């Protein structure tokens, strides 16, 4: 099939959040499966510093009384064709900045629609988040082009109809929706980035005021868990960690713990229970729970803690002050560094992720990949990727709790701290986690099924002829 991914982000050249990871990784796997997948992305002013882009455009268009160009390149490190939407509104900017984002991304969406109508006609346009929400509305009049809309962040829903009427063409059937709700209604298929989150957003607690609409269209709503690049993030070959290792050579992993303790200024002690956290410091990630509980946990145990991330100033200050109370046992790094994050995954014993809500989550999968046991709240994608440790039946991959309460988090962390004492069981838990398949190939197979379902095509894995052996 001919599939065009339209999005505001695509790793590794333009990434802020998880959407960039999906758009940067999924197309190259789908191409290996036989699909002709391409990406349509804004031509941000910083892109020439990150990749080679031909000077001359391949096409010129007109949308919302604006001229624009389209340049063709290749996504670095892949064979995926990349179309760059050129307009002065995107040239001097970061990905998200300024007060005119609603106008900029509506123009971008309009340009993508014109491109599909007039230059490269796909079978499917795969749209991502509100920035591309108008495309399913416009394509509703093009029955030969179908649309998939993926919700990465339901909290940001884009401009409303009253504003859109002022800047672009809004079909009469769009009614009074914002762009997110309009996309949900008119896309041929809608998905989120985990099955559990797909169910949760149909409730008032998670639906961001459009839970009624999401329930109404539940027949075309599904959830597909994101993946991670298991070739890039591989503890057996990672050049950023002190000692490479596998599930069969877990004893080597201790060198990463000692190296991490030395790097971040913790007391070097391979027997100390070391917890890591790599996160945005925002309420969604459970920072209010951590602040209420961590002081008590550190006082009650001999554990160590290392934090990497940035976010709200309040949470940054609180975590910094908390670290100052436990010198040699707690380290706080208010920044983001990919290499250090890998060393935290590879060197910690457990990884803390007590999210209030979590559409999918990548960090828990990275932690499992590197042998760090997740401590998570059962919500969204965390339910679909981490199962609670059951030592009797030798099952599970982490420690889980349900209620969003400090005491519940404290109790769960104490259980993990106590479980760490039993080294043989702990290593078996690590091995189960490291054996999980979080590759993009697994996710791509689910998207392939989704695309095929839109055209009534069978799943190739279910239509393989059965081999029957007979005696001659």
UniProtKB/Swiss-Prot annotation:
EC class name: transferase
Record has Glycosyltransferase as a keyword: yes
GO biological process, one term: glycogen biosynthetic process
Pathway: Glycan biosynthesis; glycogen biosynthesis
SUPFAM superfamilies on file: UDP-Glycosyltransferase/glycogen phosphorylase (SSF53756)
Amino acids binding ADP-alpha-D-glucose: 15
Reactions mediated catalytically: [(1->4)-alpha-D-glucosyl](n) + ADP-alpha-D-glucose = [(1->4)-alpha-D-glucosyl](n+1) + ADP + H(+)
GO molecular function, one term: alpha-1,4-glucan glucosyltransferase (UDP-glucose donor) activity
The protein's Enzyme Commission number: 2.4.1.21
Keyword Lyase: no
Keywords of the record: Glycogen biosynthesis, Glycosyltransferase, Transferase
Family annotation (HAMAP family): Glycogen_synth
Family the entry assigns: Belongs to the glycosyltransferase 1 family. Bacterial/plant glycogen synthase subfamily.
Function comment: Synthesizes alpha-1,4-glucan chains using ADP-glucose.
NCBIfam families listed in its UniProt record: glgA, PRK00654.1-3
Protein name, as recorded: Glycogen synthase 1
Source organism phylogeny: Bacteria, Bacillati, Cyanobacteriota, Cyanophyceae, Nostocales
UniProt gene name: glgA1
């Amino acid at each position: 099939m001919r599939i065009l991914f339209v999005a505001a982000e695509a790793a590794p050249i333009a990434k802020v959040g998880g959407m960039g990871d999906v758009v940067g990784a999924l197309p190259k796997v789908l191409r290996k499966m036989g699909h002709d997948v391409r990406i349509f992305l804004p031509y941000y002013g910083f892109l020439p510093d990150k990749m080679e882009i031909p000077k001359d455009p391949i096409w010129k268009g007109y949308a919302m009384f604006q001229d624009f160009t389209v340049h063709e390149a290749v996504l670095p490190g892949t064979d995926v064709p990349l179309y760059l939407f050129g307009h002065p509104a995107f040239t001097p900017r970061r990905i998200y900045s300024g007060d005119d984002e609603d106008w900029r991304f509506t123009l971008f969406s309009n340009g993508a629609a014109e491109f599909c109508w007039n230059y490269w006609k796909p079978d499917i346009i795969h749209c991502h988040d509100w920035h591309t929400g108008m495309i399913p509305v416009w394509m509703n009049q093009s029955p030969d082009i179908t649309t998939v809309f993926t919700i990465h962040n339901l909290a940001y829903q884009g401009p409303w109809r009253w504003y859109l009427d002022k800047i672009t063409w809004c079909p009469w059937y769009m009614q009074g929706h914002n762009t997110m709700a309009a996309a949900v209604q008119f896309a041929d298929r809608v998905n989120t980035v985990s099955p559990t989150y797909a169910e949760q957003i149909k409730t008032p607690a998670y639906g961001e005021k459009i839970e009624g609409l999401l329930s109404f269209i539940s027949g075309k709503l599904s959830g597909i868990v994101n993946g991670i690049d298991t070739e890039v993030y591989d503890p057996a070959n990672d050049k950023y960690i002190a000692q490479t290792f596998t599930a069969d050579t877990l004893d080597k992993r201790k060198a990463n713990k000692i190296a991490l303790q030395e790097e971040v200024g913790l007391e070097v002690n391979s027997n100390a229970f070391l917890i890591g956290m790599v996160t945005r410091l925002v309420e969604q990630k459970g920072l209010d729970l951590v602040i209420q509980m961590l002081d008590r946990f550190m006082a009650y145990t001999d554990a160590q803690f290392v934090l990497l991330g940035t976010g709200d100033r309040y949470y940054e200050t609180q975590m910094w002050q908390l670290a100052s109370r436990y010198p040699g046992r707690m380290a706080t790094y208010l920044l983001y560094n990919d290499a250090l994050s890998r060393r935290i995954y590879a060197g910690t014993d457990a990884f803390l992720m007590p999210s209030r809500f979590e559409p999918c989550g990548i960090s828990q999968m990275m932690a499992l990949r590197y042998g760090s046991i997740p401590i998570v709240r059962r919500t969204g994608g965390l339910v679909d990727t981490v199962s609670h440790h059951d030592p009797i039946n030798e099952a599970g991959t982490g420690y889980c709790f349900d209620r969003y309460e400090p005491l519940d988090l404290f109790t769960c962390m104490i259980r993990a701290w106590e479980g760490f004492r039993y080294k043989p069981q702990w290593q078996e838990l690590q091995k189960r986690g490291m054996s999980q398949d979080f590759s993009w190939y697994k996710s791509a197979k689910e998207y392939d099924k989704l695309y095929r379902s839109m055209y009534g095509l069978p799943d190739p894995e279910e239509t393989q002829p059965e081999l029957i052996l007979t005696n001659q």
